[in-house]
Amino acid sequence: MLYNLSTSLIKKVYTAFVVPTEREDPVAVGFDMYPQLLFCCGLIFGDFIKCYFLTVKILNNRWERIVPFRDYRYLERQNLHYMLQQRKITLAESEIPTHWYNIMADMPNKPLPPLHPGTQQPIDAEALAPLFPMELIKQEVSTEKWVEIPDEVRNLYSIWRPTPMFRAIGLEKALGTQSKIYYKYEGVSPAGSHKPNTAIPQAYYNAKEGIKKIATETGAGQWGSALSFACQLFGIECEVFMVKVSYEGKPYRKIMMNTWGATVHASPSNLTNAGRSILEKDPNSPGSLGIAISEAVEIAATHDDTKYSLGSVLNHVLMHQTIIGLEAQKQMEKAGDYPDIIVAPFGGGSNFAGIAFPFLQDKLTGGKNVRAIAVEPTSCPKLTRGVFRYDFGDTVGMTPLIPMYTLGHNFIPSPIHAGGLRYHGAGAIVSQLLKDGIIEAVAINQTECFEAGIVFA
């Protein structure tokens, strides 16, 4: 399962682990409790980012605090030079879920409605129609618990789904823990990430309405790659605004998007009023997802044959990703286990929602005491340091106002390697769940993530 660090440039594995320990020293071998752990955090081998390893201190059978896991040299001291012994849990194609799960149906407090950027009144479907196909608008506001996956979408999912789950037995031994560690691996998709889970249905619904072109943004290139792949399947033209710092630092992502027929621009660009306004203020702007969103939205809003597509944040996007967790539930049942903790990286919410929401259904309706922890970068800590309020989803202020934890739509994060996590706000659903104390959030430094990724590799 583990790919060669020097050669695999796009494969992405979602993994992380939590170590319950009695001591400050993360190599402690005495434990008060051994919860089963299921995780879905990110690691790109050869270009790796988003891997979050945490140490949890237990006192009096309580999870007292979460601190970064720093002591990796103990692996050498214990002469544990293997990390590959794992147990694979698979599903048949016939077990691909037939419906997406909409957590809105089970939330005790529904998110506040999005507001029109001009009137600041609740926005209606007519105002969203220039940007999205009607079926996605319906999904965005729906409170129906189960939304059927179209047969054509499900058939395309079968190109790579169901994705495998692994029990990281070698990692457990390396840590000296009796906790069970599982991870769901989404890197088997053609684009190398979880993003095609929503790119495919978004392209499908646009194609059904006769849309000829989709404009979008991308950070590190994962979403742009996924949508390029999906648009190619449905004969739709794809135009991608890629955050400049990633455009320059990750040229292979641009090549991948071009291979699937997409046109890719560095953002901010001189192609839009939004881009030009940013460059006038800062000709050397590294760009941000908020800026790239502004440019893509402008293209969609000014061209009748073009719609806009977003790879995270919005309700329908998060719902499409729940296919990950729905499969994981079946795989955990096959393994005879159930997770106590779920961990996932957090940029706008799609990865986290995908693995966590189906298990949170058990918490909201079935009394399961599962914990879901969103892990974000310290350079863009919207969940841990942001303010809950209405804010724009883009930098210029063209999108509807969304109720979210936000650092402010003008916030430009540091140009960290994890380009897909450089977003100022969180989706409305995730923000409401955090506000209600149903989920948790922590922030981790980039260097610690790199070190932890090397240990896992």
Summary of predicted features, one role per range:
Residues 223-286, 382-392:
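Active-site-proximal loop->helix
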Residues 185-198, 214-224, 314-317, 343-348, ...:
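Active-site nucleophile and cofactor-binding loops and adjacent substrate-binding regions
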Residues 201-211, 225-237, 258-259, 356-366:
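Alpha-helix C-terminal capping segments
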Residues 146-148, 278-280, 285-316, 324, ...:
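Active-site/ligand-binding loops adjacent to catalytic centers
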